[in-house]
């Protein structure tokens, strides 16, 4: 007989009633598969449960023996150790906090009667605390703003005028050092006689060098299209460049060596020459800014040549001093001679010798010593390079300056040959040549589209707006149009020049363009071409109604007057096709322009109202149908061409496949035969083995 132990609630004598339900709930949750730890609210129950376990272990064992079936542990027994472990962990932390919690409870009990009085004062205290917090936040924000204001740094835009002006300031001391340091080192009198001035200029240039390094740390640069203004980034960017190392070397205080060697050694300041890149940068920016770049390039080249000749003259004088003045015919003459003892004569003679040598003219005394020969050979090589540079650069500059004239002259020559070949009258030839002369003298030979085609669309539109928009707004029908349409039309305006006596349009001509007078005078003349009715001047326009092709116009699409140029006239032309192309994107503007055109025709009595209100014109429908037919024909031809290409490609592919088959067939046959042969050979061997 198996004994079945039935545990009742009375078996757990030492377990308080408060703990039982909570523990049972947690155990049932764990049986159902819920993996959750006990919350902080269950810490007390866990500790009480642990105490009951320690006091009555028999009850714990009897509780565990409560199974669903005999001989097998229940799910409660499986999960209970984990639950008890969790209870122990929580209990250990709770035991440490028990004395503190007891003290807090005592304080709370004591402070309960006081809290009733303080609850009344709580709103006032809360308000005061909130006000104090707001004040602190405002003070912190004010401090942050002040700190941000302090951190804000004035950044120089490298493309602005301030940076360009500073480049000019730093170029002056650089050029001073490059010209005077070598001269003072070679000509002792120049250094000793004007020592005070040189020292003042030297240290002033050093101050400018230091300021230039500071300016470099405040010069912005573009990062993702935006100018960087953070001080730390600017400094790090400058330090990471190779120029920073050169700048540091150029401001090393080598003047301290004056204490050891004396004031007659200005060559100790040669490290100041390392700042030459700033001079090159200034010249480069000036070349892009000036309106006369070719002249600036020539003058810049001449300056470089003069500096090279100056340095060569100083080196020649120093070599003569090292060998001895007057020791041979090649060196500088004896300085004891009054004619050659002056400082001005020393420099001029050396400069003259250097110029003759570097320009390969010669006519100088021949060298005597080996060192003199080496120096003259080096000078001749440098002179050849300088001469080639001069000829090449000046030749290219002159060709660039005359490129426009040469191209224009080529056009005139081609037209002259054509008129001579076609036997054009002499009067017509004179008119054509005068027209070309007018274009050249008034600098109207530039093709605007050719010049502006390299610019982005937005920049090109802005230039066209600045040049033509005011002129286009003078036209009545375009006065109230939206800005987008005006920009489209401005880009389509074409400049035209007419010579005296040229007809812009004649009565009865089909109107395909409208004209706006930019400069010059036009006359509305009779059929005889002499009688003038009206003179049109700058800002006038005509032909705007004809390009709208308004239905019901009695004049149709033809010109109603003869307009002739009195002198040379500059006009802007807007074609009908360009206008209609622009109006396709602006249908509302098209309707508004047609209404304005109808009002103008009604005022002049040139509008047939019945036809205008008759609805759509069948001619327009016919035009649309013809356009559709032409587009369909175009598509058919394209489809036929594509189909023919497809068929030809198929034929070529088939031919290639047949060639490949012919090539591979013998190879495949040989391989199959080899396989069959190997199979027959292996058969008898297998049988013998068996």
From Swiss-Prot:
Q: Glycosylated residues: list them.
A: 327
* CC per GO annotation: intracellular cyclic nucleotide activated cation channel complex; photoreceptor outer segment; plasma membrane; rod photoreceptor outer segment; transmembrane transporter complex
Membrane topology, Extracellular segments = 186-195, 252-264, 316-342
Regions of compositional bias (Basic and acidic residues) in chain numbering = 111-151
User: Example GO molecular function term?
Assistant: protein-containing complex binding
Membrane spanning stretches = 164-185, 196-215, 242-251, 265-283, 292-315, 343-373, 374-399
Q: Where is this region: Disordered?
A: 33-76, 88-151
Annotated spans, Ion conduction pathway: 293-402
GO biological process terms held by the UniProt record: calcium ion transport; monoatomic cation transmembrane transport; monoatomic cation transport; sodium ion transport; visual perception
Q: Where is this site: Central gate?
A: 387, 391
- Phenotype upon changing residue 293 to A: Affects ionic permeation
Pfam families documented for this protein = CLZ, cNMP_binding, Ion_trans
Name the positions where 3',5'-cyclic AMP binds: 559-560
Membrane topology of this protein: Multi-pass membrane protein
**Region: C-linker, residue numbers:** 403-479
Q: Where is this region: Selectivity filter?
A: 360-363
Q: Tell me the protein family, please.
A: Belongs to the cyclic nucleotide-gated cation channel (TC 1.A.1.5) family. CNGA1 subfamily.
Q: What does this protein do?
A: Pore-forming subunit of the rod cyclic nucleotide-gated channel. Mediates rod photoresponses at dim light converting transient changes in intracellular cGMP levels into electrical signals. In the dark, cGMP levels are high and keep the channel open enabling a steady inward current carried by Na(+) and Ca(2+) ions that leads to membrane depolarization and neurotransmitter release from synaptic terminals.
| Domain text | The C-terminal coiled-coil domain mediates homotrimerization of CNGA subunits.
User: Could you describe the subunit structure of this protein?
Assistant: Forms a heterotetramer with CNGB1 in a 3:1 ratio. May also form cyclic nucleotide-activated homotetrameric channels, that are efficiently activated by saturating cGMP, but poorly activated by saturating cAMP compared to the heterotetramer with CNGB1. The channel binds Ca(2+)-bound CALM1 via CaM1 and CaM2 regions of the CNGB1 subunit; this interaction modulates the affinity of the channel for cNMPs in response to intracellular Ca(2+) levels.
Q: What is this protein called?
A: Cyclic nucleotide-gated channel alpha-1
Q: Which organism is it from?
A: Bos taurus (Bovine)
Q: Which gene encodes it?
A: CNGA1
